[in-house]
């Protein structure tokens, strides 16, 4: 039903063999750069079908199962393309809902993604959709927030070490 999480993690996961190796790499590089710059994660998954699941339910369940986004920031985005079902859905973590509301994402699907898909241009449709999502969400989080969060976890430990060193 659900594909297993890729190990190592990939941002572009095509279980339909729709995208060329070159297109996958170009899109992967774009999403790696976005994640490094913002700490947010966008994953794209192409599956043949969602089976008996509604596409929204499938997308949210897959996003939870794979753990897309930083857990403490809940800043993941999952673009799911069910190719044989001819459906697209974009799910966001709560941390990005303010800048990526459902109405905006529906507009991205209708205006950027689907017109390209109808012409058989899947890589271009995904790229166009990602460009709009990235532009809208770029300022929401930055990589420094993740570094601060990691540092905050070690402050009590560092305080104990400093105390021991003084004594």
Q: What are the roles of these predicted feature ranges?
A:
Residues 163-167:
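Alpha-helical transmembrane segments
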Residues 1-162:
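Folded, non-transmembrane soluble domains that reside on the lumenal/extracytoplasmic side of membranes
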């Amino acid at each position: 039903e659900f594909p297993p999480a890729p190990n190592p993690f990939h941002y572009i996961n095509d279980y339909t063999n729709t995208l060329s190796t070159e297109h996958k790499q170009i899109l992967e590089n774009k999403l790696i750069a976005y994640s490094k710059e913002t700490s947010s994660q966008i994953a794209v998954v192409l599956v043949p079908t969602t089976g008996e699941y509604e596409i929204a339910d499938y997308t949210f369940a897959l996003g939870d199962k794979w753990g897309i986004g930083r857990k403490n920031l809940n800043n993941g985005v999952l673009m799911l393309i069910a190719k044989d079902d001819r459906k697209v859905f974009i799910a966001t973590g709560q941390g990005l809902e303010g800048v990526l509301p459902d109405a905006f994402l529906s507009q991205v699907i209708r205006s950027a993604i689907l017109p390209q898909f109808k012409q058989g241009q899947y890589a271009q449709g995904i790229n166009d959709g990602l460009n709009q999502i990235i532009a809208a969400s770029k300022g929401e989080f930055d990589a420094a927030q993740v570094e601060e969060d990691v540092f905050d976890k070690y402050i009590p430990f560092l305080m104990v070490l400093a105390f021991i060193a003084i004594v």
